[in-house]
Structure formats: C-alpha cells, structure tokens
C-alpha cells in the first residue's frame, strides 16, 4: 500500500512514517519544514527516517538511506500546482494529513499563516483525494475545536459551535470540508482530535516540554485561569496506535444516522470523527 504522510518532519508524522514502514507500506513523506519552532528538531526527526538534511530541497524527492520504501519531498500544502502534480504522479492509496500550522496562541498574531496552511492547504489535499481516487483520507483535527464547551470529558457528540482561537476554527473547518467531500464525492474520511501529545522528539512549544524546561532552569511555570484546569496528556505511542488502526478502518455510511437527531461524529456519507487520547483528564491544580 502506498501512503502519503504530510507533516512527516513533525512530531506525530515522523512516528507514523516509522510505523507504516515497519509493517511494509510504501511511504512518501511531505513537509515544508517551516520555522515555527527549531528546524533542527525537524531535520533530526527526518534523520531517524534515513533522510540527510543536506539533501533536502524544495520539490526534490529524497530517497531514505535506511529504507527503500521511504521518500521525502519538501512542499507547501498551499502550493496548488505542486500538490496536484504530486497526486497525479504518485497514485496514493491512502493519505494521512498531519501537516498544519500549529499553535493556539501563535494564531492570534499570525492569522494568515493558519488560513493558508490549514484551509487552503487542506483544500489541496481534498482535491488530490477527489481527482486521484484515494481510498481513505485520515486527517488531524484537534481537541481545541471544543472551545467554550465546558462539559468534561469531551465527547464526539458534543457541540463544537464556539471555537476560541483561529487555530481551532481552522480545525473545525477541516472537519466540515472533509464531510462535504465525503458527501459530494464519496471520499472516505476520518478526522482525529488529538489531546496534548507528549513523548520523545516532542514539540518544544507544548506544555510538557515547557513545564520541564522551566523546572530545569529554575523558572516559574506559567499557568492560566489561576491554574484551575483539567488536561488530557496522551503518550505518542498511544496516538500512533490509534492512527494506524484508523488507517485500516475505512468509514462507511451510517445507515442509522438521523437528521432529526444528528450525530456530528458520523453521517450518511463515509465520514467519521474520533477523539484520540480523551476521557481520563488530569487535574493540574485546584485553587484553595
């Protein structure tokens, strides 16, 4: 099976590539290696996949020196022509879209980057899946879509009508766009809402790294809402196990779906939404 993994230099994407390769799939990894955080970390992850950073260049396919089944190419998702050529030339069986402009607070200062990558870029992925008959699109959503929803633990059946960041709004938009393409063109799609993923090679902007770095350097840990909060932390291996199982489980139409009592996580279209790493929140702090 030939699978495209976008965001292959990212935390989750690099692990997905390794697992797919370990089971014998052919994998094409894509990433733009932007500077949202230290690019050396991204090149380091690619190094674990056999990609020499000195060979990486825009639009150039690089063959892994550790696996004949893995190639990497540097492309921006929002580059419509490059994405069209990629899909046309490679004939992917399945797509795992993990590329996105990440970060909740960063979206406040850099809104256009989120629309370009997370909306325009995702549209290019959907169009590739549509025109080149991809059998299953798996894509990253986010727990951020729950926004002002105060009920915990979150459920896929909960409302996501009130996002509180542009990042969350783009992820909600991805779910709506995917459903539209599943409905109009019959493209099976599965969206995964991740909850604070941590582990080796993790992102330096995420709370586990920030907490540990502050403690190591004797700085106070920044907390919000007076520190009174719940948070789900999910180990990377558990996330990857969930993704791999979903890749092989292609969604079908839910024949029991009712327009009078709609389930937002499924549809009459081949469409599904899952929470990955949710339901056991950790109490971080209780105010006296």
Give the location of each predicted region.
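Conserved small/polar residues in nucleotide/adenosyl-binding loops
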Residues: 285-288
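Glycine-rich "substrate-gating" loop/helix at the edge of Rossmann-like oxidoreductase active sites
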Residues: 164, 194-205, 225-236, 278-280
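Alpha-helical substrate-binding/gating segment
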Residues: 212-221, 233-273
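N-terminal Rossmann-like NAD(P)+-binding domain of SDR-like oxidoreductases, especially those catalyzing
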Residues: 1-197, 247
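Active-site loop of short-chain dehydrogenase/reductase
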Residues: 133-137, 187-188, 220, 226, ...
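Short-chain dehydrogenase/reductase
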Residues: 107, 195-196, 258-259, 273-275
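An acidic site on a long C-lobe helix of protein kinase domains
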Residues: 118, 235-239, 283
């Amino acid at each position: 099976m030939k699978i495209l993994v976008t965001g292959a230099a990212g935390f989750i994407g690099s692990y997905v590539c390794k697992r797919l390769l370990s089971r014998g799939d052919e994998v094409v990894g894509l990433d733009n290696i932007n500077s949202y955080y230290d690019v050396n970390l991204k090149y380091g992850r690619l190094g674990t996949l056999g990609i020499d950073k000195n060979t990486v260049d825009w639009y150039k396919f690089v063959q892994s020196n550790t696996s004949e089944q893995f190639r990497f190419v540097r492309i921006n998702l929002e580059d419509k022509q490059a994405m069209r050529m990629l899909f046309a030339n490679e004939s992917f069986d399945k797509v795992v879209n993990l590329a996105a402009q990440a970060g909740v607070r960063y979206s406040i200062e850099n809104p256009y980057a989120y629309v370009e990558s997370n909306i325009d870029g995702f549209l290019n992925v959907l169009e590739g899946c549509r025109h080149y008959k991809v059998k299953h699109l798996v894509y990253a959503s986010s727990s951020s879509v729950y926004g002002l929803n105060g009920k915990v633990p979150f459920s896929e059946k909960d409302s996501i009508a009130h996002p509180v960041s542009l990042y969350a709004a783009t992820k909600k938009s991805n779910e709506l766009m995917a459903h539209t393409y599943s409905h109009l063109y019959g493209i099976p799609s599965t969206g995964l809402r991740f909850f604070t993923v941590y582990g080796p090679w993790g992102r330096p902007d995420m709370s586990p790294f920030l907490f540990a770095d502050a403690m190591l350097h004797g700085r106070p840990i920044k907390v919000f809402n007076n520190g009174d909060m719940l948070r789900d932390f999910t180990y990377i291996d558990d996330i990857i196990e969930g993704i791999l199982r979903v890749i092989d489980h292609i969604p079908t139409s839910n024949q029991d779906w009712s327009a009078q009592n709609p389930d937002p996580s499924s549809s009459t279209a081949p469409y599904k939404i899952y929470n990955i790493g949710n339901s056991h929140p950790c109490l971080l702090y209780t105010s006296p």
